[in-house]
């Protein structure tokens, strides 16, 4: 879960305040000391932490808070607002005013630049754009091949001229190619280095002068913490960045980069990415991220993920089947696939208000559990999936052997499935009687 350590500490500290009827200056001082320590441990820039704590404390000591009937909730509201301000207040969108829109991707080696280029292409393609990926890393062995593989995985063309032509000339030729072939977005994957150096910056500056990109996005590894902010400062000084993409937010990222970059460089975070799957990228919303960190959920992002993963026609069919109790294991398997497309279950549950990382630790969210359920269903015959009532003890034994599980695990899944089907039928009938629009669930559990 994103920023798990920081999130736990902030939530624990602020929960102490909500348990008190009245707050004193001493209470707020103690809480702010803990908040300060939590932010520093998350590798947030020291000056940023100092200003943040000062701003929260000044507002928290105001008359409106101290005399409020719910002062603890008021302080949480202030922390939420200040966290949002720290990360940029509002989302900053990609500038598509120029045709074609040129996005120059830059960053150090290992940050995930090539994969991120593919993820952005994939996202823009889903938004109705016609992106072109451009291979300008002519130095790293197999870099061009890697981009071609990425492009193929997201069904996006890759422009390449091999590794003997200069990146500047490749960029110019790619722009002409895009104009002739109707590509409205050109994503230039430039070369990275192990560290910031003059040659890297000079090459990027030359590409910038020649093709005049609408966006210069710096890809940063969130796990590098404060170093990421230093890298952002160096690149911004030479190139005037328009945005940052933070990657590897599913790792042990402590959150320092996300909470420091905007405040230190004034460069907005435009996307955040996690994992290797091409769908694992989302537009960065400072207000939603602040809410996630404080355990207040992110319902809007959850809805957006569900809408992008769910087939509308299938959702209508599913709703009818659930109401009539004709929902089968075939449908269940289909819903599992759609849910997997929404991203890791732990991340999805983390977007629900009130579900914090401590609560998630008590739940088995292993991908292996999904795989086990999938294996059991796939080991059934088509007839068994449609009519689970016919699955007797000998069939259960065969299914267990075919899926590498035990008969008791097969029994458990069938029982849970039948219980769920009954419950969903009752839910569907109840909502129909109430005459309200039924909730279209993206998955059946």
Positions of predicted regions on the chain:
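Primarily NTPase-proximal linker/entry elements flanking Walker-type ATP/GTP-binding cores
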Residues: 6, 10-136, 143-163, 167-190
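Residue-level signature of catalytic and energy-coupling elements of molecular machines
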Residues: 17, 43, 79, 108, ...
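G-domain G4 guanine-recognition motif of GTPases
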Residues: 45, 109, 134-139, 161-163, ...
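Short, surface-exposed connector motifs at secondary-structure boundaries
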Residues: 127-132, 154-158, 184-186, 211-216, ...
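Short, glycine/polar-rich helix-capping loops at beta-to-alpha or helix-loop-helix junctions
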Residues: 141-147, 228, 256
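Conserved phosphate-handling catalytic cores of large alpha/beta enzymes
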Residues: 171-174, 179, 183, 195, ...
């Amino acid at each position: 879960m994103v920023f798990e350590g920081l999130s736990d500490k902030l939530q624990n500290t602020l929960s102490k305040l909500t348990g008190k009827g009245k707050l004193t200056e001493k209470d707020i001082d103690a809480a702010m000391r803990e908040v300060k320590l939590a932010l520093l441990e998350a590798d947030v820039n020291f000056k940023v932490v100092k200003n943040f704590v000062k701003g929260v404390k000044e507002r928290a000591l105001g008359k409106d808070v101290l005399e409020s009937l719910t002062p603890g909730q008021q302080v949480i509201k202030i922390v939420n607002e200040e966290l949002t301000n720290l990360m940029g207040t509002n989302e900053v969108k990609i500038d598509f005013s120029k045709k074609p829109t040129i996005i120059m991707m830059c960053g150090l080696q290992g940050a995930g630049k090539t994969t991120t280029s593919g993820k952005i292409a994939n996202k823009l393609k889903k938004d109705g754009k016609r992106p072109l990926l451009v291979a300008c890393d002519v130095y790293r062995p197999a870099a061009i091949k890697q981009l071609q593989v990425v492009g193929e995985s997201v069904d996006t063309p890759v422009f390449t001229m091999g590794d003997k032509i200069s990146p500047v000339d490749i960029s110019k030729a790619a722009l002409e190619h895009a104009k002739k072939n109707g590509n409205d977005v050109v994503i230039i994957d430039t070369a990275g280095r192990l560290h910031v150096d003059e040659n890297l910056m000079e090459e990027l500056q030359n590409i910038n002068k020649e093709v005049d990109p609408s966006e210069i996005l710096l890809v940063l590894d969130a796990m590098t913490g404060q170093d990421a902010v230093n890298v952002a400062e160096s690149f911004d000084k030479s190139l005037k960045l328009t945005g940052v993409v933070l990657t590897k937010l599913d790792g042990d990222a402590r959150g320092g980069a996300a909470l420091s970059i905007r405040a230190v460089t004034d460069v907005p975070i435009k996307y955040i990415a996690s994992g290797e799957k091409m769908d694992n990228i989302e537009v960065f919303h400072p207000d939603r991220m602040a809410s996630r960190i404080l355990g207040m959920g992110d319902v809007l992002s959850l809805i957006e993920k569900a809408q992008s993963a769910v087939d509308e026609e299938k959702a209508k069919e599913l709703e009818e089947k659930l109401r009539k109790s004709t929902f089968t294991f075939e449908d269940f398997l289909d819903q599992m696939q759609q849910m997997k497309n929404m991203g890791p279950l732990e991340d999805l549950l983390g977007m629900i208000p009130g579900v914090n990382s401590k609560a998630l630790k008590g739940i088995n969210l292993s991908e292996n559990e999904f795989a086990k359920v999938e294996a059991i269903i796939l080991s059934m015959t088509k007839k068994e999936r449609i009519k689970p009532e016919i699955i007797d003890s000998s069939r259960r034994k065969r299914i267990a052997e075919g899926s590498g599980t035990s008969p008791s695990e097969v029994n458990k899944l069938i029982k849970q499935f039948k219980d769920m089907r009954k419950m969903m039928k009752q839910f569907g009938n109840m909502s129909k009687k109430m005459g309200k629009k039924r909730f279209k669930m993206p998955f059946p559990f």
